[in-house]
Amino acid sequence: MGSIGNGRNGSEVGIQIPAMGNKEVLERPAIPRWPRLGVVMVATRAVALVMAVLSMALMISAKQRGSLKIFGIEIPLYANWSFSDSLEYLVGMSAVSAAYCLAQLLLTAHKAVKNAPVVQSRNYAWLLFTGDQIFAYAMMSAGSAAAAVANLNRTGIRHTALPNFCKPLPRFCDLSAASIACAFLSCIFLAASAVIDVIWLSNM
């Protein structure tokens, strides 16, 4: 080749363009994964599920026959959870809450298999928060209604001749009390899940 005006050989003149290789771009993920917080969320829902199932199972098994003497007259008694609307409400809400917690756990397991974030968007976090709040209040309402009936059975009615029904029916009263306790524990863990949802929302 001929020379250029500056006296340099044309083969020596050129523009060097840096090679564009595979550039690794480190971007901060838009959605925090927070493995520890995800584990806590799964744990609270699992415990809430277990407590709801126990509450339902214990109340369904609350049945007993006995007898009671009033003014020297022996009266046969039969206690069954299905005789009370409040106890039926507790069983129903425990079943629905257990189904809700189980569905959330299955969704979380599906995301874990796909290595996806536990909470994928703010809308999903709000949905979780709303659901956890609703079922926490529902379990608290059901537990309170059932507790009123259980307390009436244990203490009787004041200023009347009705006695303590738990003396001739101890198994029924004990199972009912255990079921109500599990319902309140399920409420507490659902409320804890709602708090975790708020933490997710505040960091998204």
UniProtKB/Swiss-Prot annotation:
Main subcellular location of this protein, as a coarse class: membrane
Source species of the chain: Oryza sativa subsp. indica (Rice)
Ranges of the Extracellular topological domain: 61-88, 146-179
Keywords in alphabetical order: Cell membrane, Glycoprotein, Membrane, Transmembrane, Transmembrane helix
Subunit field text: Homodimer and heterodimers.
Record's protein name: CASP-like protein 3A1
Glycosylation positions in this chain: 80, 153
InterPro entries given in the database record: CASP/CASPL, CASP_dom
Record family assignment: Belongs to the Casparian strip membrane proteins (CASP) family.
Ranges per topology, Cytoplasmic: 1-39, 110-124, 201-204
Membrane topology, from the record: Multi-pass membrane protein
TM region positions: 40-60, 89-109, 125-145, 180-200
Localization: Cell membrane
UniProt GO cellular component terms: plasma membrane
Keyword Aminoacyl-tRNA synthetase: no
